[in-house]
Structure formats: C-alpha cells, structure tokens
Amino acid sequence: MAEQIRVAIAGAGGRMGRQLIAAAAAIPGVTLGAALEREGSGLLGCDAGELAGCGVTGVTVESSLERVAGQFDILIDFTRPEGTMAHLAFCQAHGKAMVIGTTGFSEQEKATIEAASQHVAIVLAANFSVGVNVMLRLLEKAAQVMGSYCDIEILEAHHRHKVDAPSGTALAMGEAIAGALGRSLESCAVYTRLGHTGERAPGSIGFATLRAGDIVGEHTAMFADVGERLEITHKASSRMTFASGAMRAAQWLGAQQPGMYDMCDVLALDTL
C-alpha cells in the first residue's frame, strides 16, 4: 500500500464525519479520497472540505461506494450499525480495510465483523481517543488492586443526540474492569436501578447515564470503599481528539495484514 493513505469518510455530513474530513485534510500522510452520505441527502455533490469548514478539497460527497471504489484504501466509518454493516460487506468484497468507530452493534453484528476480519484488516474501537485507551489500561490496574473489595460504578455523559446507552466507551470500561477481575461483564453489570432495589449486590458493576446539551463525552470509573474513593475520569472537549485517533489508526492499519485490531494494537499499549 502506498505511504500516503487514501481514506473515505462515511457519514460525511454528521458531527464526527465533518471532524474526520477536517482531520484527513490536516494530518500528514493521509489523503481524503472520498466522502459519503446516504442516498437522497441534500449534501450530495457538495465539496467535502467546504462541508467540514476546512476549504475546497476537490472531493465531492457521493452516495455510493461503488462510484468511489478506486479512490480510497481505507474506509473510516462512525455511522450507525445498519450503515456500517452494509459498508462492511462492500469492503470485504473489494479488499478495503476499515476503521470502525460505530457503537451499538448486536452480538450477531459483532460476529459478522469478526468474520470479515479474516479477509480484510479492521480496527474496531469504542473510542479512538489516546487518553481513553490509556485510561482502560489504568482501570485494569486499579481493578486488580482494589476491585475485590470496592464498589465499582461507571458514570458517562454525552450530548442529547446520542442514541445508544450506555456508551460504547462505558461498556469497554466495564469489560476492562470485569476482565481484570476474571469475570464477564454480562454476569455483574447493573444498568438500571428503580424503586426499592435493596442493598447493592457485592461484586456488581453499576452504570449511570446522562444525556444533555452538547457534552462531547465524559467517563468516570469509581472504586469506592469505606473511607476513601478512587475516581478515574476522562473528559473530551472536542471531537477532533477522536478524529485524530482515527487517522492514526488508519495510518497504522495500512501496513497490517487482515485481522481484527483495536486501539491498544495501534498504540502498542500491550508492550508497555
């Protein structure tokens, strides 16, 4: 694959799509090859750079991957599960790698993505922020030391338009903690509390969700004991942190063989 990675951005008109276009235009080693929106969108035919507010790029927004198949090496997809799955089928058939930031997949959809990774290289992550992925490693360490005797709660807050809850990042936090404790998240997660719930179940991991205003993303894991409490928090103030991480993932993915990867692989966190 050429040193200059050509990327296509799915969902070009969305909040993340525009940030991804701007990042592709600004980051050395990456070229914006294509931008995509759904059929019937009023944005079709627009210049992608002007749409993102970063100047003319000469790349027009299209509705069909077929029409731009020769213009990109890697598809970056932060859309919705149904759209991502359609894009996945195309990329598998045409040998295109994918960076997937979509969340809310069903177990069957996750299995389909895993199967596709036998044929094309895929980075799948709930969050592309470097800070969040470092936090996941810190949570594993905290859980190993404190998780056996502390109450563990995960709190997350996002903007009013987010459609899935808990966030993919919150679930990844829970999975990191549960894994460090030798448990499955499914066996210990508590997602709702309403009415007379009784005392907190020992060993459970609780989740709390807020949706309000324009919050980009805030996540906190709490390890609470009697007399002290440890909180590990990440706050994102701009979606550009996710977009920059996605470009970093795309650059790394260009040199990889087919397989399923995550941001820990991209950042080589397992070697630290």
UniProtKB/Swiss-Prot annotation:
Q: What is the lineage of its organism?
A: Bacteria, Pseudomonadati, Pseudomonadota, Gammaproteobacteria, Enterobacterales
Name the Enzyme Commission number(s) assigned to this protein.
1.17.1.8
**Pathway given in the UniProt record:** Amino-acid biosynthesis; L-lysine biosynthesis via DAP pathway; (S)-tetrahydrodipicolinate from L-aspartate: step 4/4
Q: Name one GO cellular component term.
A: cytosol
Family annotation (Gene3D superfamilies): Dihydrodipicolinate Reductase, domain 2, NAD(P)-binding Rossmann-like Domain
Cite the entry's keywords alphabetically.
Amino-acid biosynthesis, Cytoplasm, Diaminopimelate biosynthesis, Lysine biosynthesis, NAD, NADP, Oxidoreductase
Give the family, as the similarity comment puts it.
Belongs to the DapB family.
Residues annotated to bind NAD(+) = 11-16, 37, 101-103, 125-128
Q: Which Pfam families match?
A: DapB_C, DapB_N
Protein name as it appears in the record: 4-hydroxy-tetrahydrodipicolinate reductase
Q: How does it assemble?
A: Homotetramer.
Q: Where in the cell is it found?
A: Cytoplasm
Q: Which domain of life is it from?
A: Bacteria
The residues listed in the UniProt record as binding (S)-2,3,4,5-tetrahydrodipicolinate, with positions renumbered to this chain, are: 159, 168-169
What is the documented function of this protein?
Answer: Catalyzes the conversion of 4-hydroxy-tetrahydrodipicolinate (HTPA) to tetrahydrodipicolinate.
Annotated positions binding NADP(+): 38
Q: Which PANTHER family match?
A: 4-HYDROXY-TETRAHYDRODIPICOLINATE REDUCTASE 1, CHLOROPLASTIC-RELATED (PTHR20836:SF0), DIHYDRODIPICOLINATE REDUCTASE (PTHR20836)
